[in-house]
Regions:
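Non-catalytic, conserved peripheral segments adjacent to functional cores
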Residues: 8, 12-15, 24-154, 169-170
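Short acidic/polar capping segments at secondary-structure boundaries
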Residues: 3-4, 22-25, 161
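Conserved SET/PR-domain catalytic core that frames the SAM/AdoMet-binding pocket
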Residues: 1-3, 150-160
């Protein structure tokens, strides 16, 4: 039984690769935005965002992370006329121990993904193919980052609400 593409089942050509510091644990997810806001409320002054600032890796207290703790990581590229290679060598380019790697693909056009935060898991998102935007929210400040090169990853520490959107189409 062959299924033909139609406007109802059209998907984007984007592939989002996710590198995570924790194994899957449903209890680590914060899926309700109101619950997220309650968790991160504190007396800490949240400074204005700067996505280029390297992460301080505040592992233990997700409520202390802000969008300025998110950072772009450039991975090495080995150029070859037969196709480029981007190696990811654990702690050489990743600021945490890798426990899980997965990818999201065949995303329906106009769909948003993510829409959650983590209590303890760090993630790096990579546009392995195509492009998409990531909206970062620390409960006070918001910032949108475009990912469109497979040699760059966006490090998202715990306590940051992330929504992936506007995946590129065919």
């Amino acid at each position: 039984n062959m299924m033909w593409r139609s406007l109802e089942n059209f998907s984007t050509n984007s592939v989002c690769l996710i590198i995570a510091s924790e194994k899957y644990d449903e209890d680590d997810y914060i899926r309700n935005y109101r619950d997220f806001k309650k968790l991160i409320q504190s007396d800490i002054k949240r400074e204005s965002p700067d996505i280029e600032t390297p992460s301080q890796n505040k592992l233990a207290h997700p409520q202390y992370n802000t969008i300025s703790d998110c950072s772009l990581i450039e991975f090495p590229v080995i150029k070859n006329r037969a196709g480029n290679i981007t190696p990811i060598n654990g702690n050489n380019n990743i600021p945490f121990d890798i426990e899980r790697v997965f990818y999201i693909y065949d995303i329906p056009s106009g769909e948003k993904r993510g829409k959650h935060a983590h209590k303890s898991c760090h993630e790096i998102l990579v546009a392995a193919s195509g492009s998409f935007k990531v909206e970062l929210d620390d409960g006070v400040n918001k910032k949108t980052v475009l990912l469109n090169r497979p040699s760059f990853g966006l490090h998202i520490p715990p306590g940051i609400w992330a929504t992936e959107k506007e995946y590129s189409a065919g």
